[in-house]
């Protein structure tokens, strides 16, 4: 792309890049902006079909992200489908004021399914966090191990690799530590 300029209606665009998608793009609202300011960013599948899917419900997004056979430009990339586990103990380092964390829920999703708001429930209250960057930061931790599509793992990141996530509650152990 050296020496090339992307334009929309004759004007240079503000271009955003990422190494790997989840198979579906999003609009400019992912950065907290009004999507109409970046009409060239569209929430469509990342393939030749450019199909628009409604991934704004947790059920629809989870079904999409669990599909290992999604047809996408980068579906063979190592981070196309990744997963990790975290615990209430790890999350307590960044989230205070709710007691022992017992639940995490994505309460709203943006175009393409990115996590827009996160509700954290604890034994002494709850908090809601907004913005995919903030959510990625809150849930990320350098100690997490990311299982990649290629069978290898990655570590050392203090934020989640993407805001295109779903969360499963995997239960609480005898020490009252909840795993997600």
Question: Where on the chain are the PLM-derived regions?
Answer:
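Conserved, single-site charged/polar hotspot
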Residues: 1-180
């Amino acid at each position: 792309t050296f020496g090339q300029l992307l334009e929309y209606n004759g004007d240079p665009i503000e271009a955003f890049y990422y190494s790997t998608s989840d198979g579906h793009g999003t609009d400019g609202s992912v950065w907290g902006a009004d999507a109409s300011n970046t009409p060239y960013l569209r929430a469509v599948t990342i393939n030749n079909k450019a199909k628009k899917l409604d991934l704004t419900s947790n059920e629809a997004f989870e079904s999409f992200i669990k599909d290992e056979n999604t047809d996408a430009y980068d579906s063979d990339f190592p981070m196309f489908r990744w997963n990790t586990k975290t615990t209430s103990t790890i999350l307590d380092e960044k989230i205070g004021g709710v007691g022992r964390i017992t639940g995490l829920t994505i309460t709203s999703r943006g175009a393409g399914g990115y996590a827009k708001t996160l509700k954290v429930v604890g034994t002494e209250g709850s908090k809601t966090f907004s913005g995919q960057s903030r959510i990625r930061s809150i849930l990320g931790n350098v100690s997490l191990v990311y299982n990649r599509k290629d069978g290898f793992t990655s570590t050392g990141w203090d934020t989640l690799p993407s805001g295109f996530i779903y969360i499963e509650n995997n239960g609480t152990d005898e020490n009252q530590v909840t795993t997600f």
